[in-house]
Amino acid sequence: PCRLPLPGVVIFVHGVNSDGEWYDAAEQGLCEGLNTRLARQAAQLALPGDGTGRLIPCAYTPELDAAGFIDPDRSHANFIQPQPHWSPVIHFRWGYKATKRDVKTFGDSVFLNEDDYWGGGPFANGCSALADLWTDGLNDRLFLWLTAQHLNPVPGREVYHCPHRAYYAFAALRLARLLKSIRDKQADCPITVVCHSQGNMVGLAAAFLADRLGIQADNYVLCNPPLSLVDKNGTEDWVQRYTTNGAGQSGRVSHGARLDTLANFFKLLKARAGCEPPAERVDQCMANPQPADGSPGFTAASDRQQWGLDGRHTHGRVTLYCNPHDQVISADSVQGIGWRGMSADEIAKTGGAGVFAQRVFAHAYPVGAAGGKDYDFWAERNKRDPDPYPGSFWIPPSPPAHYALQQGVTSNQSVVGKVLSVLSAPFFIVATGAVKARVNADPRTGWKIPINAPALPESFLPEARHYGEALKEFDASFDPAGKARNRNRANAPPDDPYTQHGVHRTRDGRDSDAPLGNEHTEAQLRYEHRAQLRMKARRQGKAEADGSVPGETQGGSASADYQAWRTGEIRQMLKDCVNAHATDHSSILTNPMHAEKALAYDVAIGVCTLSEQDWRELRVEADWRYCFKGLPETHPHYYLGEYFSSGFMAKQPLEEWVKSGEARRPAGIVDTRTYARPEPGAAS
């Protein structure tokens, strides 16, 4: 029998400091939810078996070995497991690749693996406006000798100077080119782009670059985006004071430019509503109006009426998933819409009517109930009973910035800076203790956002999932790094620092960092620690002249002194993170239940006719590591593999290459900034 076609393509786009840790869970849930939406559950189909069109996730081979190194045998030829699959999902992978020169310049400031790259790039180099994707990276200098690390209270999130953000613009171009590859294979294929965190900035920028190519995706789902619409932000203005545009303006991207850019994005997607295929064609290929088990079936018309925006269409839609508990993009210098959502006024000012919808994922608040209600941030927060932290919006309370002498000394590369860090410590310790500026912003008093996404077939309370277990509270408290250790590990060597660390309780006594993970989560922890150790080793003079760190290289030999230092550092990193706050930043997408019950109803539905060979080629193209080796040289996008291979494009530094040609900033991404260019002769 002929297999029922897939309903379209869904592209996942991860954020910074990430290799798509949510991809597998979200794909699993999405496939299950689409089986329900399309009436393809086993009991609903007349014919048994997986070959009838029931959606099955695509499985991928592990990327790391147990020691936390990249598996050298993994390649474009075997990164997809051979087991049967029938999935609409493509995993888009992107990041920062350091040249040999970059390793010497930035290797002591950013995480890099043994091949000198990092998925999503450094955590500290995120941004809150699309125009910033074409600017210099973070400048960690606050004032004279003071750096961001002097005041950073979050362990494991070192903030140092970062490389140019051109790798974001390059990733956006690759995503736009991937959209073109799909459209070239099937012009009317439904495409939904699902973005998380900083991946939203890549995804939105790709929409503008795709428009330049004459193509576009049909739907976007924006999860936890850092895109900020707050009118004023003095903290971000100060951080961005050295950032300039072509007109010589400096500082934060202006409020008006942010609104105009988002309005331009909405216009691009709104135009896709008219590209939905005729209902008759969808029904001819996919209808199941009377399932075998007597349950409600699927027809295009009923699907659009129930789950389409305004009961009309499943194309031409942007859906925002925001989380009021997100402790990453609620940072005072960011305040993204993935935390605070969009108010009715902001929706109106950006022309969101008829294209924009939003869902709130919050503790004890049902997702998918009938729309027309407002989510009141403070009112919902004050419903907590019992309330462990009365008066604080954040649970636990947001950590206050405080003067950290050791961090400040480490962050300064000059002797003068180190000396001044010590001499000024008494003053700044008292001053920061008195000010008690918090890392995370609070919502404005009375802040409300409308919940206007279509009702779901089954509303549900969101659940955070850690190490395969559902948590009682969606707004989690602590998330110690040590939990990622393998709970079933046996025969660990006695000198292993992950074993030596033991078990430590959190400061509230309610939790601990006892191992809850498996071999994969521990491998990921070791992988991240190796990157952190490389950075520390370069900063402390323990690296080779070329920046390499033999003790963190597969097959490399470490001296006894380095091994002792390494063991001490790992134990300290684990200890420092015992009281790490749960970020609640990936909670929406790491639970497959959320994708099954919500995401599956927010994607565009149509008929996808891509062949199995098409799917494999597209999945190879979507992974920046495999373009050169996995695509034929005749492929129109083969050339994009140069960046991962060398750190250059057209043999130019990436920041030079993106200034002109296909990767230049589109005019629809507006770049006006807070401070005007100084007049000639003006006093400085």
Predicted regions and their residues:
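Loop/turn elements at helix/coil->beta-strand transitions in domains of secreted/extracellular proteins
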Residues: 5-9, 86-88, 186-191, 215-219, ...
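A conserved short beta-strand
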Residues: 213-232
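Alpha/beta-hydrolase-fold catalytic nucleophile elbow
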Residues: 95, 223-224, 321
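Active-site catalytic motif of lipid deacylating hydrolases and related acyltransferases
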Residues: 13-21, 29-31, 45-187
